[in-house]
Amino acid sequence: MLFLGMANAYVMRTNMSVAIVAMVNHTAIKSGEEEYDDECGDRDIPIDDSQDGEFPWNAALQGYILSSFFYGYVITQIPFGILAKKYGSLRFLGYGMLINSVFAFLVPVAAREGGVWGLCAVRFIQGLGEGPIVPCTHAMLAKWIPPNERSRMGAAVYAGAQFGTIISMPLSGLLAEYGFDGGWPSIFYVFGIVGTVWSIAFLIFVYEDPSTHPKIDEREKKYINESLWGTDVIKSPPIPFKSIVKSLPFYAILFAHMGHNYGYETLMTELPTYMKQVLRFSLKSNGLLSSLPYLAMWLLSMFISVIADWMISSKRFSLTATRKIINSIGQYGPGLALIAASYTGCDRALTLAILTIGVGLNGGIYSGFKINHLDLTPRFAGFLMSITNCSANLAGLLAPIAAGNLISDPSKPVMGQWQIVFFIAAFVYIICGTFYNIFGSGERQFWDNPSEDEQKPALESSSTTNPPRLSNGSSAPRAISSS
């Protein structure tokens, strides 16, 4: 259910990136296409002007529309991280996604009746609703997943982000071209229905932690709790704010997260525009081909997570070394790919191949910094994620604004403007990944263990304890859902 929830969340984030290509009347604004034709010559597949939309929004306005979701998204990160620690995560996550899904139905009327700023307001509210998804998911993972399974299970859940993108982009392209009510509005109606159904199912069938699940086997419950918390009763101490603020491993995660989000949001929000404006793919092809990098990321994230867990369980690498090696793949890979793609010019196949490989390697972050919060502090993982995710999305919301302003000048060559966009994203990826390699850690921090009985890292105790075999022959843990 958490995998599907992450998928729904990213559907809501990414569908506007494809929809806006169909919404905007490209012949009514200057996009610099004439200069692009001079650079690359005539393309074999020209843009079909009949696909132009109803709104004369330039690149800068499109950047504000694409970023408006993230303004709402970042506001709710830290508050929900604190609330989830105190009251539990399940209700905040479920009702937040329900708000996000219901407001998706209002996107078409907001755009047509309220213009740019009406649309921005609705997308802002959607962002508010989606705010709990990551900190609350992290908090629930901390309660359900033993330390020696975090790479694999964490990657499996967060790979829902790529799965949602894979579904959203091609389906949004098809709905924009063949859907009802002018095409693009059907994107928000269809995904609004899907998100609403998931939210209701999540609130009915999912439980906060093993202790509240009515059907979980007692041995399984004991195994999960002891592998996470030792033999002590699970406690809820106050958040150690001062220790967190002084923690270099925390800042390593913070900067890695910020660098990732800036680069990732640059690609996620701007790739469909790049595919249309520079690579000149049709609307239908745009959505399908824009999803290929995220298909690669989904598949590679799962493969890399298995390698990461093997590195840890085989004891060939320390937890710290594993996180840094895998995270380097996840951040240096896309950074170098963006640099390479900026020099491929008009070669559509080569550009798409490089971006697909680069974004695919980005899947390493799910077994790198993205799951590292749980290593440092199982007790406060959700709160830490709320801080880093809030900061990361503040960085991420700058990406479409920066890109929109950089590519909005029709007097400059389009390829040159996009090269700057790619260079900036690559630089941020590499610098932040390097900071993580210098200061990151996989060790459980002292401020997560308030009692002397729990000074021993949970990873050590869990790695020497075999999971109980259940009556059906499977090993713990099972799914969070009761279904």
From Swiss-Prot:
Gene3D superfamilies: MFS general substrate transporter like domains. Residues 460-483 have a biased composition (Polar residues). InterPro entries: MFS, MFS_dom, MFS_Na/Anion_cotransporter, MFS_trans_sf, Pi_cotranspt. Residues 447-483 are annotated as: Disordered. It is a multi-pass membrane protein. GO terms for cellular component: membrane. It is found in: Membrane. The chain crosses the membrane at residues 64-84, 90-110, 187-207, 292-312, 349-369, 383-403, 420-440. PROSITE patterns: MFS. GO terms for molecular function: phosphate transmembrane transporter activity; symporter activity. Belongs to the major facilitator superfamily. Sodium/anion cotransporter family. NCBIfam families: 2A0114euk. May be an inorganic phosphate cotransporter. This is Putative inorganic phosphate cotransporter.
